[in-house]
A protein has these predicted regions:
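N-terminal glycine-rich cofactor-binding segment
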Residues: 7-26, 43-75, 90, 111-122
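Glycine-rich beta-strand-centered segment in the early N-terminal region that forms part
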Residues: 25-39, 54-101, 140-142
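NAD(P)H dinucleotide-binding glycine-rich loop of Rossmann-like/cofactor-binding domains
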Residues: 97-174
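Mid-domain Rossmann-like dinucleotide-binding core that forms the NAD(H)/NADP(H) cofactor-binding site
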Residues: 143-221
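C-terminal substrate-binding/catalytic core of Rossmann-like NAD(P)-dependent dehydrogenases/reductases
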Residues: 226-234, 270-317, 325-326, 335-336
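Glycine-centered, small-residue-biased loops immediately flanking beta-strands
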Residues: 261
């Protein structure tokens, strides 16, 4: 095992990232060292690149970033069982305490003591990453690595989309970023009748259509209610997935839900968003906040891909990790889906 490795690092407090040589992590008791094959750039990685307020509050440079990845086990720490060296794996990015009430009920995503890989501790944009064995997820060899590289984001979409029953339902998704687009595919796969996605970025709507949604609406140019009529909706949407964190999108979503409709909220806003409580109460709406993934979502993701859910339309760019700057430029251009970095060459 070599002692030094390439890694994409947040070097100092300020915009930008650097490719540096850093020590290869050594797995302690109960930990697993993973050799990285592919990684994917997440929106939070872009926040760290730009060094926005959220990043300033969470990241302590110098630090290796990144939390979406697939690879193989390189070394097992003392006491680790159930895994083998060379086995293909990914990992849950929230390292949790395991003893709080939420952890005990299986809601690890709400653990108040969680530590984020690539945010609060060194991450996966490197040749190797080290995580606790309980966070390691075995990945079947039949699954394409480019897709598995963004299972973390896929998990957010899965958690959001499957929060409420979908069979025969009409679904509105506000926000056609990669997670929103993936959610559109999940909803159709899970039996939704009509799936409509909205955005004001024309580029993002085309891959949403390739994922199988019934209508992709640019709300800056098109009338959503007209599209609803064309799709045969008479009372509004049964299920809403708010993925944008945008106030205007949220308010429009609430306005077109049927009475008794259910809404999953994943998109984080830049600030507080006002809510008309009277509208929610009188229409009997259910609003559910979504954060991260439940461990069962990892199994659901693998089974959906094995069952035929094709997520490749979400991938728009592929680069070698040494060209990571091109990947971040693509992400920040507003004209990208998932960007995958290759660490195998």
């Amino acid at each position: 095992m070599k002692q030094m490795m390439d890694a994409i690092v947040k070097p100092t407090a300020g915009p930008g990232l650097e490719l540096r040589q850093v020590p290869v992590p050594v797995p302690g008791p109960g930990e697993v060292l993973i050799k990285i094959h592919k990684t994917a750039i997440c929106g939070s990685d872009v926040h760290i690149y730009k060094w926005n307020q959220w990043a300033q509050q969470h990241v302590k440079p110098p630090q290796v970033i990144g939390h979406e990845y697939v690879g193989e086990i390189a070394e097992l720490g003392a006491g680790v069982t159930g895994f083998t060296v060379g086995q293909r794996v990914s990992g849950e990015g929230h390292i949790t305490c395991g003893h709080c009430r939420n952890c005990h009920t299986g809601n690890i995503q709400w653990c108040k003591h969680h530590v984020g890989v690539g945010v609060d501790r060194d991450g996966a944009f490197a040749e190797y990453v080290c995580i606790p064995a309980r966070n390691v997820i075995a990945i079947d060899e039949s699954l394409p690595e480019d897709v598995v590289s963004f299972f973390d984001a896929f998990g957010n979409a899965t958690h959001t989309a499957l929060m409420f029953p979908l069979i025969g339902e009409d679904v509105l998704i506000t926000g056609a970023g990669p997670i929103g687009i993936i959610a559109g595919g999940i909803c159709k796969y899970a039996g939704a009748r009509r799936v409509v996605i909205t955005d004001v970025n024309e580029y993002r709507l085309a891959p949403a259509l390739r994922m199988g949604v019934d209508a992709a609406v640019n709300t800056a140019k098109e009338d959503l209610r007209k599209v609803m009529h064309e799709q045969g909706l008479t009372e509004g949407f049964d299920v809403g997935l708010e993925m944008s964190g945008n106030a205007a999108a949220f308010h429009q979503l609430i306005s077109v839900m049927r009475s008794g409709g259910k809404v999953s909220l994943l998109g984080l806003g830049d600030g507080p968003i006002s809510v008309d409580m009277n509208q929610i109460i009188t229409n009997g709406l259910t609003l559910q906040g979504i954060y991260g993934r439940k461990m069962d979502n990892w199994h659901q993701m693998s089974y959906m891909v094995q069952g035929g859910l094709d997520l490749t339309p979400v991938i728009t760019h592929r680069f070698h990790y040494t060209d990571f700057q091109k990947g971040f430029d693509a992400m920040m251009s507003g004209k990208s889906g998932k960007v995958v970095l290759d660490w195998t060459k």
